[in-house]
Design a protein with these regions (language model features):
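Conserved glycine-rich cofactor-binding loop
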Residues: 22-23
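Conserved glycine-rich Rossmann-like NAD(P)H-binding loop of the short-chain dehydrogenase/reductase
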Residues: 36-51
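The beta1-alpha1 cofactor-binding region of Rossmann-like NAD(H)/NADP(H)-dependent oxidoreductases
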Residues: 64-75, 108
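Substrate-binding pocket helix/loop in short-chain dehydrogenase/reductase
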Residues: 101-103, 110-112
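Active-site helix of classical SDR
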Residues: 126, 162
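Residue(s) in the substrate-gating loop at a strand-loop-helix junction
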Residues: 146
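Active-site-adjacent segment of SDR/Rossmann-fold oxidoreductases
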Residues: 151, 172-182
């Protein structure tokens, strides 16, 4: 079995980029990675929360909206300039759900917003960092999806559709990058009590 790329003490000093880092699972991921020796760049929209995270963990704060392709590319350019082009792991945690509307009452705007953050966010960061991850010779991408990517539920069609999309993108990416020694991992958690999920749902 291949070694766990995120195991404690096995990757000290390597560079990770974590999205959705200002709260919830993303914040906890930054805390765990920095505690085990990773050099972490923490991406999120809320600069004030990133500043607190920096003080607590030493992570590098990067204010960025993953749905904004130009902003992601600019952030990646700055990160790669600081690291000498080196990134070993991309951890895509940014995501979210909006509302509980049934399909008959669904808001196209809400559906698009969920698709942008849950699917296009992964696309944007992937396009920005995959060349550096390939160059590392042992890069890893971890995409957080959801058990909502396994089956529909009432009032969740927009979120289901977005997470199914993220799952499909991840599975295709895994096949596409296999020959580049780029590991692509998907984690599908069930319901997690976080501030953001409570606000969105």
């Amino acid at each position: 079995m291949p070694a766990n790329p995120f195991a404690p003490n096995s990757q000290a000093g390597k560079v990770a980029v974590v999205t959705g880092a200002s709260s919830g699972i993303g914040r906890a991921t930054v805390q765990q990675l920095t505690a085990t020796g990773w050099n972490v760049y923490a991406l999120a929209r809320r600069a004030e929360r990133l500043a607190i995270l920096e003080a607590e963990t030493g992570a590098h704060p990067v204010t960025c909206d993953v749905t904004d392709e130009a902003a992601v590319r600019a952030a990646a350019k700055n990160i790669l300039a600081e690291t000498g082009g080196r990134v070993n792991a991309l951890v895509n945690i940014a995501g979210g759900a909006i509302g509980l509307d049934r399909v008959a009452d669904g808001s196209p705007e809400d559906y698009l917003a969920m698709y942008r953050v849950n699917v296009l966010g992964i696309l944007n960061t992937g396009r920005a960092f995959i060349p550096a991850l390939r160059a590392s010779g042992e890069g890893s991408i971890l995409n957080l999806t959801s058990t909502a990517a396994e089956g529909g539920y009432e009032g969740g069609a927009g979120y289901n559709a977005a997470k199914f999309g993220a799952r499909g993108l991840t599975e295709a990416l895994r096949l596409e990058e296999a020959d580049n020694n780029l590991r692509v991992i998907e984690i599908r958690p069930g319901m997690v009590h976080t501030e953001e999920f409570s606000l969105n749902r």
